[in-house]
Amino acid sequence: MQEVEQCFLKMKLRKMLMLLKVKRQQHRKVIMKKLLKKISQIILRRNQNKLLHLCIVGLGNPGDKYSKTRHNAGYDFLDLIAKEFNTDFKYLKKIDADYVEIDFEDHKIALIKPREFINRSGKTLQLVRKYKVKDTKDILVVHDDMDLEPGDVKLKLSGGHAGHNGLRDILKVIGNEFVRLRFGIGHPPNKEQTDSWVIKKPNPEEKREMANAFERAINNIDKILLKDWMIIMNDLHSNEH
């Protein structure tokens, strides 16, 4: 009888120990879950603190061969902004682009020139969207536009690619809800000459007109950096060349 009682007590004790072990494991899981949630919140807050007010991405083709060509209007305009703020670009591997940040009225703004060829601009824009901004509406893409004449500059809040292969690639990865600043380069005499047209330098008259368009946009740089889009549109579109 005594042996039976001892056996029963041992079983009961074993069961209690198992229950205690299970409760400890459950308690550990609850603690770990809370800890992981807290860590995630801290990481999210830190990432949000690193997000930028605006990223301005200038499209173009890298290399001396394509410097100052029609397709590189985006690059050229960003160079002017950098000059305005007396700063220089440095390569940032994380987004595979030439990159610089500027401070303006308590805001941080990035100037970005993708290192990929213009038809593959989506790669950098996808990384910009992932690491640098809260929303695609905080991205301004600067590019050439054959539907506008040299000297024309317009702002667009969203839309399609209008045949621009750089925009086409961007739309595939981040959608169409980003702002665009479009500099006119005009049409070639024949549609068949489009590919060669965009990678050639503008003639002297076109160059002067494009310089005027750059100047008009630079005159609005404060508003651009503050994302006062409607004011900019009103100014640029009401003073069309």
Set out the residue ranges of the language-model regions.
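Hydrophobic alpha-helical segments within soluble ligand-binding/sensing domains
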Residues: G163-G166
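Short glycine-enriched, charge-decorated loop/helix-capping segments at active-site entrances
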Residues: K154-G160, V198-K201
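Cationic, amphipathic, low-complexity alpha-helical segments enriched
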Residues: M1-I31
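RNase H-like, two-metal
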Residues: K21, G186-T194, K200-E205, E209
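Nucleotide and nucleotide-moiety/phosphate-recognizing core
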Residues: L9, L13, V30-L157, R168, ...
